[in-house]
């Protein structure tokens, strides 16, 4: 934003020492050779002197680990990290503001699904920490710590280390298990448990004896009961069986009951939930660098103060809102009408009517004058500062109107939840369309106000001078006043700074205004007078000729015969 630090700096050159006409003072505004086009309510293309781009279109090619804490899942997604899959041990105890999931993350253990995948993913991401609290579970006459060849850890058969696979005992027994855990703490607990779906009935009886099995998990407010779905499936890491993982939140004072006759994948403890933490998740292949930024997208971090961005609709942290427009320019200067070089110093000089002054560099509004001492140009601080004060806070006000920071994660749903995914995408697309429209309308409103304000200040300056001069000068209709008294540079300065005393010059101005001067004929007046003179001469010549003919006819000197 232009900051005016020079008060009425006069750029003058006495190039017209021999000027003998009446002094002239004109008002105009700043202009540049090439302005910037902005959109207003009334016009899609209005040229202004200066404008500020509001849409960020450049991003860093990396993710910034400061000030937000980033945790790189590497080959593990957040759910595998919570289950304790092999290869995810680096996530034990991890704490984050943003959990970075990689597109190349893979499952490395027994094949599984999560019926409420998106909900569990969101809970884990928002919690911001893998704070696992191990517990003692007293299971009755069953074998614990089941392992699978699909789940290798250091080339040894293993399993998810946060879960306990219960199978029948060596004595071929799997009695009813009924175990209760009470939450006596002051925080909510997240229990993750599973149900194994064997591929055949033989596998079911070999592992659990009972066919069918059943798993029921209850709290005071909820109950989930699952019967295993026995059936052959495509082999994944050598297994045609599957595990379905479920989750239950136990609030302080509540309890959880595990009831099963087979197929339970039991928890080894719980995750501590932090309701105060507001963390999130981002799926991207962009590497983590060493920069600083509060905003991250799937295409890289943003470092900007602009209120909008069109880089990515997926953004986390303290981010500008995503809009579809590639550019939205906020006018920070007045309407630009470049000066016409052929007009000269005082040819149609009214900047707010016809054109601006490119030489007016110290302010937005100013004066030009011509008197016996020469010519000069000076900026006017008062009107300039008045306009700047009204415009200066526009960007801040615009940011305040959009201060609900944009935060949009990419939601992932299981394949069976495709309709939910479609609905989610439709809602997000609609929100973006609305925000894009609102942003464009908001900027257009602000631009219209800016142009109206700057035009108004130009008119105020003109009226201020007119009220000072009154009948001491004549408005020439082009932004200039012809002054009818002697006005040296000190007099001109008094007009500019508002200290001009009309009464001092009143008598002189009145005398000069009504003084009879010789007629100064311009080429246009000469033509009119010549035509009038010629017409009168012709009329008199014809009249004399007719009078002579009538006189001659009466005296018999001329004989007229009219034949029909």
Curated annotation (Swiss-Prot):
GO annotation (BP), single: virion attachment to host cell
Secretion signal span: 1-16
Location(s), subcellular: Virion membrane; Host apical cell membrane
Topological relation to the membrane, as annotated: Single-pass type I membrane protein
Topology, Cytoplasmic side: 549-564
PTM info: Palmitoylated.
Residues carrying lipid (S-palmitoyl cysteine): 553, 560, 563
Its job: Binds to sialic acid-containing receptors on the cell surface, bringing about the attachment of the virus particle to the cell. This attachment induces virion internalization of about two third of the virus particles through clathrin-dependent endocytosis and about one third through a clathrin- and caveolin-independent pathway. Plays a major role in the determination of host range restriction and virulence. Class I viral fusion protein.
Known partners and oligomeric status: Homotrimer of disulfide-linked HA1-HA2.
Family from the record: Belongs to the influenza viruses hemagglutinin family.
Note: Major glycoprotein, comprises over 80% of the envelope proteins present in virus particle. The extent of infection into host organism is determined by HA. Influenza viruses bud from the apical surface of polarized epithelial cells (e.g. bronchial epithelial cells) into lumen of lungs and are therefore usually pneumotropic. The reason is that HA is cleaved by tryptase clara which is restricted to lungs. However, HAs of H5 and H7 pantropic avian viruses subtypes can be cleaved by furin and subtilisin-type enzymes, allowing the virus to grow in other organs than lungs.
Protein name: Hemagglutinin
Species whose genome carries this gene: Influenza A virus (strain A/Duck/Czechoslovakia/1956 H4N6)
